[in-house]
């Protein structure tokens, strides 16, 4: 994939590697080269964990994994867990949100015995915010949020809050308690503010980098040579930043883009504080 004049062929984090190719034959050759390089240093690729994920325009030909003794056809998948985050061929974030919800409940239930035995409210709140909230929002720096996804996160967090303070949904309704009332009782962080703060913090790091990393290049990339799909353009990661942070005049014309503001660390920290009150 060509991005701003450079070819993006792989992503690497420790021994977790993604190869990016425009044709299955190219992918097979790249895999063979990787196998060869790994064997030179005594490493082997796990064929059981190596899968093929394609977009809807990809050639359906099979990808093969070769070794000196045998050749294996790799399985195609519609989704894959990479670095703890589920990615899929449709760029749909909802399955990952469901995973985060399950992870948050697992974290809550796993720490329940500890929190139930603690009477100090401040410690209980700190445990919740440091164990359950990160499980619910893991990887949220890279989320492209819309109202439906935000509501899913908010509802899950509200359920966890009720469990923390010992109130069921029925009891909440009988006592005519609103979301704000439960928040006063729980004193935990607001999840959507927490997500926004993490995203803004990450956006600032990306904008200020000057070492040519792919995260920055992909954020700035405009694929002018690609045709747009028919229909409404999917929401992009930077759309919320343009809408909420970019400054405009009375006619809606851009005065200062968010990426320019983010290059000034002090000014960006002020932006984060203004946009994430009480997070």
From Swiss-Prot:
Signal peptide: none annotated. Transmembrane segments: none annotated. InterPro entries: DNA/RNA_pol_sf, RT_dom. Residues 1-87 form the Reverse transcriptase domain. Coiled coil: none annotated. This is Putative uncharacterized transposon-derived protein F52C9.6.
